[in-house]
Amino acid sequence: MEPPASPEASAQASPEPSPEAPAGPTGPAGAVRTGRGRRVAVIVAAVVLLLVAVALSLALGVRGVALRETWQALVDPVAGNVDHDVIRGQRVPRTIIGVLAGAALGLAGGLAQAITRNPLADPGLLGLNAGASLGIVVAATAFGVVNPGVSVWFGFLGAALAFVLVFAIGHGRPVHLALAGATVTALMVPISTLLLFRDVDAFNQLRFWSVGALTGRDVDAVAGLWPFLLVGLVLALFVAHRLNGLALGDDVAAALGQSVGTTRLLAGVAIVALAGAATALAGPIALVGLVVPHAARRLIGQDYRWVVPLCALLGPILLVAADIIGRLVRQDELEAGVVAALIGAPVLVAVARGRRVAGL
């Protein structure tokens, strides 16, 4: 009977892994690759869904049009063709507005939840939509300005005022911010309504806008808004990696060398620009910014480097889908803002009841 091998002999006999050998699929590198691959797949799937939503938005409505005919209307329109005129004159502008406004609201909601660490935060619940709406209503009633390219400046100022008021009242605490947003909204919405009711011309021009309709605007309306959308998008992507540190807490983020105040300031400017532009385009649409970030984190995880781009894709998917549903359920159409609110309300209730509101 042979004596058992000594520990030294066993250590010499056992092969050591080569440092040059790549980690297997169950190792850390494999896990990173698997996670990254899944996230890329989710992003690609979202892009495909957005393209499908755009195609359906162009084809569906009170008067349905085949996809082949829709494509011809885009690339080789026939003069006098009713379907082509409807697609190019009505459905293309409302689809573009739905995509841009949805992306802006999705991004603004994701940033708002990140900097407040509040799962209930979105531009509507924080009062930014109400502030932007008040600015745009003042532009229409006091100065006769209804062109979105000009009124967006008033919307930006109104959203900025609401943002400052909410953070001044809420002192940065998640629950207090939600209450402050409700207070600011309760203050600004009646003022906007009163101003509109006192000015019949402004009311007639903004009545569909006030309920979140994507109609009544043409492609030229986007011309004055793209700087706000571009600034908001660039800032959102720039601060995305910093939001991961902020999610760990202000003290941890500061210990990692991050300027917490600068991150919140840049994200705040992005939120105000995006909320102001979205409101100028499509009116005060609520709860899109609430639903989209929750869906993005569920699909792709908590890494804001991926959450932020996904929010920019899921937002237009939701808003364009809401617009399509509104066209189909009623012959005289239901505004996208109303349908989006009907979709978002159950999510708001579920989040409020199923999770701690203390923070993300």
Feature annotation, model-predicted:
Residues 1-360:
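Alpha-helical transmembrane segments in inner-membrane proteins
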